[in-house]
Curated annotation (Swiss-Prot):
Species of origin: Vaccinia virus (strain Western Reserve)
This protein's UniProt keywords: Elongation factor, Host cytoplasm, Phosphoprotein, Protein biosynthesis, Transcription, Transcription regulation, Virion
Assembly: Interacts with the DNA polymerase processivity factor A20. Interacts with B1R kinase. Interacts with the late transcription factors VLTF-1 and VLTF-3. Interacts with the late transcription elongation factor G2. Interacts with itself. Might be part of a transcription complex composed at least of G2, A18, and H5.
Location relative to the cell: Virion; Host cytoplasm
Sequence similarity: Belongs to the orthopoxvirus OPG110 family.
Biased composition (Basic residues): 49-67
InterPro entries, alphabetized: Pox_Ag35
Name of the gene: OPG110
Entry GO terms, CC: host cell cytoplasm; viral envelope
Basic and acidic residues: compositionally biased ranges: 25-36
Listed GO biological process terms: viral DNA genome replication; viral transcription
Record-given protein name: Late transcription elongation factor OPG110
Function: Involved in the co-transcriptional or post-transcriptional endoribonucleolytic cleavage that generates sequence-homogeneous 3' ends during late transcription. Involved in postreplicative transcription elongation on intermediate and late genes. Also involved in DNA replication and in multiple steps of virion morphogenesis. Required both for inclusion of virosoplasm into crescents as well as for maturation of immature virions (IV) into mature virions (MV).
Induction summary: Constitutively expressed in abundance during viral replication.
Ranges where the record places region Disordered: 25-100
């Protein structure tokens, strides 16, 4: 450590190096513990790096994926059932439904569940047919609307073609006028003087 002493006008406090040494020795021996830069008896707490807690991933909400699969499988089974019933038997009419209801009324045995199942199957088949007819009506309406859109688009395209043709004809007529004036200048040597009528404004 380097010590530097500045010479001041008032040097009455220390006159000799021996006094400086004695003063430093006394101050070093009689120093306070609070003044020590590196005290030995002070316990320094160990600084551990803060570790983030390992976040446990949240469990996703229990989704019923199996139910979707089951619904799809049920729909496939119902469609296959409808296809097989359509192939094997004609569509149930009103008379078939009346006969099945009459059979239910006449049958007094313990097997009451079987005729009800047959009636419900007939209703399901009938509702599937009504759904198919609704789908057919919707597709027919969509086809009609598409045809209307196509006719409108074709009308717009023909109008645009007519406009382009008119623009081409205008350009062609202006080109022919320029060619005729050029030919007149070549043959006669100078352009004809044409007097333009000036319109007078009435006040």
């Amino acid at each position: 450590m380097a010590w530097s002493i500045t010479n001041k006008a008032d040097t009455s406090s220390f006159t000799k190096m021996a006094e400086i040494r004695a003063h430093l020795k006394n101050s070093a021996e009689n120093k306070d513990k609070n003044e020590d830069i590196f005290p030995e008896d002070v316990i320094i707490p160990s600084t551990k790096p803060k570790t983030k807690r390992a976040t446990t991933p949240r469990k996703p909400a229990a989704t019923k994926r199996s139910t979707k699969k089951e619904e799809v499988e049920e729909e496939v089974v119902i469609e296959e059932y409808h296809q097989t019933t359509e192939k094997n038997s004609p569509s149930p009419g009103v008379s078939d439904i009346v006969e099945s209801v009459a059979a239910v009324e006449l049958d007094d045995s313990d097997g009451d569940d079987e005729p009800m199942v047959q009636v419900e199957a007939g209703k399901v088949n009938h509702s599937a047919r009504s759904d198919l007819s609704d789908l057919k009506v919707a597709t027919d309406n969509i086809v009609k609307d598409l045809k209307k859109i196509i006719t409108r688009i074709s009308a717009v395209s023909t109008v645009l073609e007519d406009v382009q043709a008119a623009g081409i004809s205008r350009q062609f007529t202006s080109m022919t006028k320029a060619i005729t004036t050029l030919s007149d200048l070549v043959t006669e040597g100078k352009s004809k003087v044409v007097r333009k009528k000036v319109k007078t404004c009435k006040k």
